[in-house]
C-alpha cells in the first residue's frame, strides 16, 4: 500500500477530506522522525514501537575496488510490532 492509498482509505473510513488526512499523516510521520532523531522511543500501544538502535561495525567489500573494508557502526531505525498487531497478522 502506498502513502496515497493509505490516505484514501483513511479518508473514506473516517469520512474526512483527503487533504486533512494527508496533513495529519504527514504531521505524525514528521513527529515520529523528529523523536527518533533525538534518540527517543515512540510507542503506540496495540500497534508497536519505533526506536533507534546501533548496528555494529562489520566487514564488507568495496563494490568498485573489490577490496575489503570495515563498515562503521551506525544508528538505524527499528520497528517492533505490538502484541495486538502480531495477533491480527497471524
UniProtKB/Swiss-Prot annotation:
Any Gene Ontology biological process: chromosome condensation
Disulfide bonds: none
CC per GO annotation: cytosol
Function description: Histone-like DNA-binding protein which is capable of wrapping DNA to stabilize it, and thus to prevent its denaturation under extreme environmental conditions.
Region (Disordered): 57-90
PANTHER family per record: DNA-BINDING PROTEIN HU, DNA-BINDING PROTEIN HU-BETA
Gene3D superfamilies in UniProt: IHF-like DNA-binding proteins (4.10.520.10)
Name of the featured protein: DNA-binding protein HU
Origin species: Thermotoga maritima (strain ATCC 43589 / DSM 3109 / JCM 10099 / NBRC 100826 / MSB8)
Keywords, alphabetical: DNA condensation, DNA-binding
Membership in a protein family: Belongs to the bacterial histone-like protein family.
Coiled-coil ranges per UniProt: none
One MF annotation (Gene Ontology) recorded for this entry: DNA binding
